[in-house]
Amino acid sequence: MLMIRQRTTARPEWDAELELSLEARSKSRLRCFTTAGEDVGLFLERGQPPLADGDFLLADDGRLVRVRARPERLLHVACANAFELTRAAYHLGNRHVALQIGDGWLRLLDDYVLEDMLRQLGARVETVEAPFQPEHGAYGGGHHHSHGGEAEFSYAPKLHQFGVRK
């Protein structure tokens, strides 16, 4: 089994590829297979953003592995104007939907309830098969459950500071 424990910088060449769905790219622990069929064990640092299309991983044996986003069934959303597209994005964000944002369009994982809501808002919705690369959040860091305070964890950039006023 090819063991992978760390991310690395992009390179012009690689030894193997993983083609993974968003769900698989979001996991820090995963058993999967390279596109050539080799068994892989991912043991990545927890709390990091999902792997993105084009990311590189370094295997324990020194091989470089490139990540590809697997095409998934998505809803492609377009609207008549920027206001309607912004309104659609607002309603999807209010439901904490993973969302890919393009120039004049939105994409999300196929969901018939959300598709119906978007159509009621006046959006044009079509189903497409494409790699899904949603935004991973405004804070740029991964999700964490740190109880050790700021010395152990901090968001960058710090947008606000909570605490008792003195």
Curated annotation (Swiss-Prot):
Compartments it resides in: Cytoplasm
Main location: cytoplasm
GO biological process: protein folding; protein-containing complex assembly; urea metabolic process
Molecular function per GO: nickel cation binding; unfolded protein binding
Keyword Nucleotidyltransferase in record: no
The entry's keywords: Chaperone, Cytoplasm, Nickel
Source organism, top-level taxon: Bacteria
Entry-linked Pfam families: UreE_C, UreE_N
Recorded GO CC terms: cytoplasm
Family of the protein in this entry: Belongs to the UreE family.
NCBIfam families xref list: PRK13261.1-1, PRK13261.1-5
Role noted for this protein: Involved in urease metallocenter assembly. Binds nickel. Probably functions as a nickel donor during metallocenter assembly.
Protein name (record): Urease accessory protein UreE
Gene from which the chain derives: ureE
